[in-house]
């Protein structure tokens, strides 16, 4: 959504880490004080995760939409701030002592051989798809990404729309972090360090453009699946994490080059359509064309 609006969010990895540590700390504290109320501890951790996601999204959204700072600079700065808070809270240590219900059911549980975490992700994906494809807000996001000046003339409330976009991005990132925390069984201060690279790569491979105005939830999911399969394949080949980052970096460069060529083809097709329309109008009005030639 942020890329479609013509922006960036380089703070997703730091958001994941901060949410993981924050939610795990609250969850472990509530569960330690009342071991018989695991569900209450999980709900407290979830509420903390969503609150952190909203806070991160507001920080990015206000900087981009109301302070008019470049999204790259804003999210790079907030990533540093979020990571600093993460290390300050955790002191660089993981947070354990989470409820077994959270770790074994949400983190590694299965329903019909499908991970529960995947099933919990489906409603969010469906909601995002409907929001982008069928709502007025989604049309506003595409309009802003395509041509911000035209969107402003059309009456789109650009600052508010961008603020909502970054808040939604922050909340979805926090939700993903909550599920990942269940998966790794602890709050991790370095969780999601590779997310900025992976998320941008997946989005571009899925059809999003760095210039904004293009892409969708379905394509982003396909791109994410491709990146995940690629990562799993490299794990099976026993490639180290450093080698994986190098390969993923090359994949991102290739994806950006393909996006540039796709944009060029789009402009060429648009120009061809304009020429076709103009030539058709000229053929339909030969008298006017002749009159213009005589005047010249």
Q: For each predicted feature, which ranges?
A:
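Single transmembrane alpha-helix segments in multi-pass membrane proteins
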Residues: 1-35, 62-69, 207-217, 250
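Helix-loop-helix "hairpin" substructures at the membrane interface of multi-pass membrane proteins
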Residues: 41-49, 55-60, 64, 113-188
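Alpha-helical transmembrane segments within multi-pass membrane transporters and channels
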Residues: 31-79, 222-223
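Membrane-interface helix caps of multi-pass small-molecule transporters
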Residues: 1, 25, 30, 54-67, ...
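Cytosolic-side transmembrane-helix boundaries in multi-pass membrane proteins
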Residues: 153, 157-160, 234-296
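Transmembrane alpha-helical segments in multi-pass inner-membrane proteins
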Residues: 173, 183-249
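Extracellular/periplasmic helix-loop junction at the C-terminal end of a transmembrane helix
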Residues: 82-110, 149, 185-186, 241-242, ...
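Alpha-helical transmembrane segments in inner-membrane proteins
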Residues: 61, 75-100, 128, 167-185, ...
């Amino acid at each position: 959504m942020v890329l479609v609006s013509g922006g960036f969010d380089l703070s997703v990895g730091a958001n994941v880490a901060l949410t993981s540590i924050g939610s795990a700390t609250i969850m472990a504290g509530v569960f330690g004080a009342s071991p018989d109320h695991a569900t209450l501890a999980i709900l407290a951790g979830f509420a903390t995760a969503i609150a952190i996601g909203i806070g991160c999204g507001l920080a990015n959204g206000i900087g981009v939409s109301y302070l008019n700072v470049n999204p790259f600079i804003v999210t790079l700065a907030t990533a540093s701030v979020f990571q600093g808070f993460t290390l300050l809270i955790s002191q660089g240590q993981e947070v354990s002592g989470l409820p077994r219900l959270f770790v074994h059911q949400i983190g590694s549980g299965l329903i019909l051989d499908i991970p529960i975490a995947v099933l919990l992700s489906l409603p969010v994906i469906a909601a995002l798809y409907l929001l982008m494809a069928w709502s007025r807000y989604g049309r506003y996001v595409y309009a802003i990404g395509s041509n911000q000046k035209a969107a402003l003339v059309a009456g789109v409330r650009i600052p508010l729309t961008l603020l909502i976009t970054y808040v939604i991005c922050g909340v979805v990132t926090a939700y993903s972090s909550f599920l990942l925390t269940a998966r790794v069984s602890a709050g991790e201060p370095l969780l999601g360090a590779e997310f900025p690279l992976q998320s941008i790569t997946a989005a571009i491979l899925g059809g999003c453009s760095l210039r904004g105005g293009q892409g969708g939830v379905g394509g982003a999911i396909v791109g994410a699946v491709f990146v995940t399969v690629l990562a799993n394949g490299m794990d099976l080949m026993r490639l180290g994490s450093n080698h994986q980052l190098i390969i993923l970096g090359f994949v991102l460069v290739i994806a950006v080059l393909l996006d540039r060529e796709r944009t060029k083809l789009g402009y060429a097709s648009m120009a061809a359509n304009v020429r076709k329309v103009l030539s058709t109008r000229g053929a339909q009005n030969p008298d006017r064309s002749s009159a213009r030639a005589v005047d010249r």
